[in-house]
Amino acid sequence: MSNLFMTATQLHPSKQLKKLQARLRGLVGKAIRDYNLIEAGDRIMVCLSGGKDSYTLLDILLHLQRAAPIDFEILAVNLDQKQPNFPEQVLPNYLNQLQVPYRIVEEDTYSTVKRVIPEGKTMCGLCSRLRRGILYRVAQEEQATKIALGHHREDIIETLFLNLFHAGKLEAMPPKLLSDNRQHMVIRPLAYCPEADIQRYADLRQFPIIPCTLCGSQETLQRVQVKQMLQAWEQETPGRLETIFRSLQNIELSQLADPQLFDFAHLAIAATPYADSPDRSGL
């Protein structure tokens, strides 16, 4: 079969990897430029959990570091939360092979969460809050200027709909976030990257994946329902998720209803009509 008519899945794995790697590098590079995620002299603390997303994040950032016109440091950090059967040597062995500076932080948050959360309830919320506090502390100790997390496009869209359906607010995950105490800058370089591309990349790179269910907890039913809904939409209408994500970059405050963000109270009719002004009244 001629290469001209070969699909991506029919390409040799090495060619698939190169093509996918170039795509992911391009998307990460665009996010970095669009949001000024990485600057000269930055010390980036890459949070590495052992899942496909954080492995991909570290891998792509290391490639970009070698090619970037600016100098920045990378420090990989893993939080060992003392979950049962956690394979403690997997990440150190992997990082030693890469010769990447890293730090393993041991904090028994698992026992704390098990003590506080009733049996059968999801532990993810409390676990996430404890983990965030520890990572902020470590970032300060390591003098990291940015904290890089592995959230991808679908994570951001799912969070948007979770907040829309269950919290009554339009809020997602920004590619760049200043912590509440204004001491830490969180970045999400994979913000433009589709989850399917990351999964395929992780498979081709054969990362030593550590299961995320060692603690026995699962995603909340709400998140599972939103994920399934979005997957069904994408299957029915390919490209819909990308359209939804683009909407987060194309906000029209005057077409929403938040009086704190748009001054509806002082809207006034102009003495002279504006030329070529679109009418969005919906009448």
UniProtKB/Swiss-Prot annotation:
GO terms for biological process: tRNA thio-modification. Its cofactor is Mg(2+); [4Fe-4S] cluster. It holds the Pfam family ATP_bind_3. One of its GO terms (cellular component) is cytoplasm. One of its GO terms (molecular function) is tRNA binding. Pathway: tRNA modification. Binds 1 [4Fe-4S] cluster per subunit. The cluster is chelated by three Cys residues, the fourth Fe has a free coordination site that may bind a sulfur atom transferred from the persulfide of IscS. The keyword Iron applies. [4Fe-4S] cluster binds at C124, C127, C215. It catalyses: cytidine(32) in tRNA + S-sulfanyl-L-cysteinyl-[cysteine desulfurase] + AH2 + ATP = 2-thiocytidine(32) in tRNA + L-cysteinyl-[cysteine desulfurase] + A + AMP + diphosphate + H(+). Its main location: cytoplasm. It comes from the Bacteria. A motif (PP-loop motif) lies at residues 49-54. HAMAP family: TtcA (MF_01850). Belongs to the TtcA family. Catalyzes the ATP-dependent 2-thiolation of cytidine in position 32 of tRNA, to form 2-thiocytidine (s(2)C32). The sulfur atoms are provided by the cysteine/cysteine desulfurase (IscS) system. PANTHER family: AMINOTRAN_5 DOMAIN-CONTAINING PROTEIN, SULFURTRANSFERASE-RELATED. This is tRNA-cytidine(32) 2-sulfurtransferase. It comes from Acaryochloris marina (strain MBIC 11017). The lineage of its organism: Bacteria, Bacillati, Cyanobacteriota, Cyanophyceae, Acaryochloridales.
